[in-house]
């Protein structure tokens, strides 16, 4: 009988869980409150910090608590153009400036926004990685819905009350620069998770992987595997709808 293969061990967690010791904490929008729903609230960017394992910088923004005599520090994903000392306005009546947080129903069509909520109040779910953004395509005031275009090119309909941050997430073009050497990849994954270096299945022995063994490195059978296969067989192209090169132009579904 073969060994427990790598993806079975990953499912158990343990050494494969993400490395969070140096993280700055969850980057979310403000909790949706009366001030944001009916007017606006002002905060100031205190500092812009690096978050280990994340491609985009984070902005520490301080707001006055609308209900208590205290200050609240929020951690936002920094947009391109945001700087320390900048005022950030959040709410329905906020101005249309980079870094401000508005409901999608309050921004004109064609506006570029990021860290967009899927449901009002979930504090940001879409277009959160460096250089990403969402484009507002159109509004339907009767149903209180807004149509947006995601970074993947897919279109999505969300509530017009869902909030977004005006502008593009900072750190764009990060993946265009090659790592060039193994040492940089080592440091990259050291703060992310234990997923590097990755030994190929065909380079293993038959006990270690379904693709292992043979007098030369070849898979020896179809690399596609069914969704219902047992976990020890699940290696390769799992439940692939199609394989091979994509030919012709790619069309996104409207």
Curated annotation (Swiss-Prot):
Transmembrane helix recorded as keyword: no
GO cellular component, as recorded: cytosolic large ribosomal subunit
The UniProt record lists the keyword RNA-binding: yes
Alphabetized PROSITE patterns for the sequence: RIBOSOMAL_L2 (PS00467)
Keywords: Ribonucleoprotein, Ribosomal protein, RNA-binding, rRNA-binding
GO molecular-function terms, A-Z: RNA binding; rRNA binding; structural constituent of ribosome
Biological-process GO terms, alphabetical: cytoplasmic translation
Disulfides per UniProt: none
Pfam families: Ribosomal_L2, Ribosomal_L2_C
Family assignment from sequence similarity: Belongs to the universal ribosomal protein uL2 family.
Protein name according to UniProt: Large ribosomal subunit protein uL2
Gene expressing this chain: RPL2
């Amino acid at each position: 009988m073969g060994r427990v293969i790598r993806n079975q061990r990953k499912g158990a967690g343990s050494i494969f869980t993400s490395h969070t010791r140096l993280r700055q904490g969850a980057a979310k929008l403000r909790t949706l409150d009366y001030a944001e729903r009916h007017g606006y609230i002002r905060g100031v960017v205190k500092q812009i910090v690096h978050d280990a394992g994340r491609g985009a910088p984070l902005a520490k923004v301080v707001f006055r608590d609308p209900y208590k005599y205290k200050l609240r520090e929020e951690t936002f994903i920094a947009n391109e153009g945001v700087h320390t000392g900048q005022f950030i306005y959040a709410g329905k009546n906020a101005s249309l400036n980079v870094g401000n947080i508005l409901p999608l129903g309050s921004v004109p069509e064609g506006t570029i926004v990021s860290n967009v909520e899927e449901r009002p109040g979930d504090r940001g779910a879409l277009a959160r990685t460096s250089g990403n953004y969402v484009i507002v395509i159109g509004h339907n005031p009767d149903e209180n819905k807004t149509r947006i275009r995601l970074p993947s090119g897919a279109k999505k309909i969300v509530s017009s009350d869902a909030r977004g941050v005006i502008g593009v997430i900072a750190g764009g073009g990060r993946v265009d620069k090659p790592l060039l050497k193994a040492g940089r990849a080592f440091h990259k994954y050291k703060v992310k998770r234990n997923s590097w270096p990755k030994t190929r299945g065909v380079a293993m022995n038959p006990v270690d992987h379904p693709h292992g063994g043979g007098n030369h490195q070849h898979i020896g059978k179809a690399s596609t595997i069914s969704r219902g296969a047992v976990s020890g067989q699940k290696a390769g192209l799992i439940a692939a709808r199609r394989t091979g090169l994509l030919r012709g132009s790619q069309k996104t579904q409207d």
